């Protein structure tokens, strides 16, 4: 190894002090590098089953965040199995080691989104065949519930992700009566997992407030920092907006749907202009 070679070099040659100091620094650096490589090599590589009702190239935050998560896990050497609904468009940005596809139905009032049918036997066999170390359920819909039961039947630990406040969404679709039942279901669901990943401290506090008692872990959403980088800033684009370098630009990136409350953003923008 490089570190031991440097040590031998010290013993064999009578270097002047400046060179000895340099070689000593290099020796320490090489030892740290070797330890880092060794630690990385010894890290366990997991087999992870990820269950989701939505997946890229569907346009929503859950699908985008999950794609970045899967890419990152795979890059670290973990093996990924995806259990998800059949899609109309195929994702070309990521290839899981295994996939289990179930039938899908469109979500009411969300024609471009769908949920997975609870095909228990198919999901259970897929999990048994892959034999994952953990099953991570991203969405709490019919497919997520099916995977929860299947994983428990095979005595495999289940973690979950809390991405969407479905209980809050209900009030935007004349479904206010469903807020409490949905809240109760979400509480039950996450309390039957070994831990739940949340995107922020605010979400963590909200889940604790309505009774989620399983361990909650804050996990930030994945961002492609190469694609989204200040070096891509375009003065030509700002000129088309009639904005110079000192102009404050308020930008919304996301779907246009009632629960996004884009009207609040527009009103905020108008209030800012008045100041």
Where are the language model's segments positioned?
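Conserved donor-binding/catalytic core segment of Leloir-type glycosyltransferases
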Residues: 244-260, 266-270
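An amphipathic, basic-hydrophobic alpha-helix
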Residues: 108-137, 143-149, 153, 180, ...
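Donor nucleotide-sugar binding/catalytic pocket of nucleotide-sugar-dependent glycosyltransferases
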Residues: 84, 100-103, 183-233, 243
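Nucleotide-sugar donor phosphate/pyrophosphate-binding loop at the beta->alpha transition
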Residues: 157-159, 168-188
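Short hydrophobic "strand-cap" motifs at the C-terminus of beta-strands
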Residues: 51, 199, 252-254
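Nucleotide-sugar donor-binding and catalytic loop/hinge architecture
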Residues: 37-46, 232-249
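N-terminal subdomain of nucleotide-sugar transferases
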Residues: 2-103
């Amino acid at each position: 190894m490089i570190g031991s070679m440097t040590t031998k070099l010290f013993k064999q040659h009578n270097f002047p002090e400046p060179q000895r100091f340099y070689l000593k620094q290099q020796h320490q650096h090489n030892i740290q590098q070797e330890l880092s490589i060794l630690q990385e090599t010894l890290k366990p590589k997991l087999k992870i089953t990820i269950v989701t009702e939505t997946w890229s190239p569907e346009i929503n935050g859950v699908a985008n965040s999950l794609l970045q998560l899967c890419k990152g896990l795979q890059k670290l050497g973990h093996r990924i199995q995806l259990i998800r609904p059949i899609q109309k468009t195929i994702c070309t940005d990521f290839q899981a080691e295994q996939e289990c596809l179930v039938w899908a139905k469109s979500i009411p009032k969300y024609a471009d989104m769908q949920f997975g049918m609870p095909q228990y036997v198919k999901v259970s066999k897929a999990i048994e065949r892959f034999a994952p170390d953990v099953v991570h359920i991203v969405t709490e819909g019919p497919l997520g519930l099916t995977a929860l039961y299947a994983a428990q039947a095979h005595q495999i630990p289940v973690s979950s992700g809390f991405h969407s406040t479905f209980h809050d969404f209900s009030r935007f679709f004349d479904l206010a009566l469903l807020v409490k039942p949905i809240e109760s279901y979400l509480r039950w669901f996450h309390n039957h997992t070994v831990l739940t990943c949340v995107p922020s401290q605010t979400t963590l506090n909200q889940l604790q407030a309505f009774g989620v008692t399983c361990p909650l872990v804050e996990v930030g959403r994945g961002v492609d920092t190469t694609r989204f980088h200040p070096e891509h800033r375009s003065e030509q684009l700002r000129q088309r907006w009639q904005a110079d370098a000192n102009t404050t630009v308020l930008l919304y990136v996301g779907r246009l749907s009632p629960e996004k409350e884009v009207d609040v953003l527009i009103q905020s923008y108008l209030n800012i202009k008045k100041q």
